[in-house]
Amino acid sequence: MLMKNIVLEVKQLKNLDINDRFFDSLKNEYEDFIIWFNNHLDRKAYITFRDKKITSILILKIEDKNENYKDFNKEFKPSKRLKICTLKVDVKFKNIGTKYLELAYNEALKNNVNEIYITLYTNHKDLINLLEKNNYIYYCDKSNNEKVYINKIKKF
């Protein structure tokens, strides 16, 4: 339990309904979202629900040295990284975003990853502010005009 009446579950994408209204903005913003979603049905997602309705989602991916970053406009050397593939939080539950970034950080530590990154468009001002408050810095652009933000993991 994260907050009153909010339940966090881990589910594979194949157990989610892509037609749920929660996904509409992702489908509208990323024209290939449905294709991407259907190609990753075994990937796990962290989901919060309130009254059986999705209120947030976090999808992570551990990348390795075989990853291709040719669409980045600045060198991004292949390395073991944690990518935040999808992070969407219903506006009424913004605090969950902070919890998800903590979860991503802990996942990076658990998997011996030195860097986390996320790509997003500049219209996501609240998310950019949240990232910057949590030690993410702007790194570069992608060819599709998304911005790349990174967080270097400090190990003690």
Report the location of each language-model feature.
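Short hydrophobic/aromatic beta-strand element in the GNAT-like acyltransferase core
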Residues: R43-T48, I57, T86
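Conserved acetyl-CoA-binding loop-helix of GNAT-fold acetyltransferases
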Residues: K94-A108, K133
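A short, internal acetyl-CoA/4′-phosphopantetheine-binding micro-motif in the GNAT/acyltransferase core
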Residues: C85-N95, Y121
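Conserved GNAT acetyl-CoA-binding A-motif
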Residues: A108-T122
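Conserved active-site tyrosine of GNAT-family acetyltransferases
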Residues: L127-Y136
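Short amphipathic alpha-helix that is part of the acyltransferase structural core
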Residues: M1-H40, A45-I47
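Conserved catalytic-core motifs of GNAT/GCN5-like acyltransferases
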Residues: T119-L120, N135-I150
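Conserved acyl-donor/pantetheine-binding loop and adjacent beta-alpha core of acyl/acetyltransferases
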Residues: K53-K83
